Amino acid sequence: MKSLLLLTTLLVPLHLGMAWSAKYAVDCPEHCDKTECRSSLRCKRTVLDDCGCCQVCAAGPGETCYRTVSGMDGVKCGPGLKCHFYSEEDDFGDEFGICKDCPYGTFGMECKETCNCQSGICDRVTGRCLDFPFFQYAAAKSPSRTSASHTERDSASGDGNAVREEIGEGNAARPSVMKWLNPR
């Protein structure tokens, strides 16, 4: 009797360990058979099902996603997206949410990878560093603020002294009709 209790005590943790490594998937086959998988050619993007056997259609941005489902299309978020779960459950008692973009600085499946780019911005799917040449070009071509020459008549934003001087001298004539400027 003691040996049966000892054997049970040793085998139960082993069985639970295998269940935890399957990511809570249900009805997974013992061995993956790709011929049993449905075609995913019509999908925009695919992900592995919870069993890790078949490619299934992935949910896109703004689409509904579920926490634990195996072999079902459109219920896991695709790469570069993460499921943001609601506090309530659906009619069947399953947790669900909406697929949203990975936060900046993360990428990949469920946004688990960290971006190692100098700018801190990378492609949310692949992790490839993103460059923004239009910002670099504009910064290289813009004149230095310190090299601009200023005259006594230049006024800063909100400084109306130069305008008051012109009005006081009588140099500024105002038209009696409102003038409309054409947009650029």
From Swiss-Prot:
Compositionally biased spans, kind Basic and acidic residues: 150-167
Residues covered by the IGFBP N-terminal domain: 24-102
Gene Ontology BP terms: positive regulation of cell population proliferation; positive regulation of hepatocyte growth factor receptor signaling pathway; sprouting angiogenesis
Subcellular location: Secreted
The protein, known as: Endothelial cell-specific molecule 1
Keywords tagged on the record: Angiogenesis, Disulfide bond, Glycoprotein, Proteoglycan, Secreted, Signal
Positions of region (Disordered): 145-184
Glycosylation site positions: S157
GO molecular function: hepatocyte growth factor receptor binding; integrin binding
Summary of the function given for this chain in its UniProt record: Involved in angiogenesis; promotes angiogenic sprouting. May have potent implications in lung endothelial cell-leukocyte interactions.
SMART domains: IB (SM00121)
Disulfide bond listed as a keyword: yes
Cystine crosslinks: C28-C51, C32-C53, C37-C54, C43-C57, C65-C83, C77-C99
Keyword Glycoprotein: yes
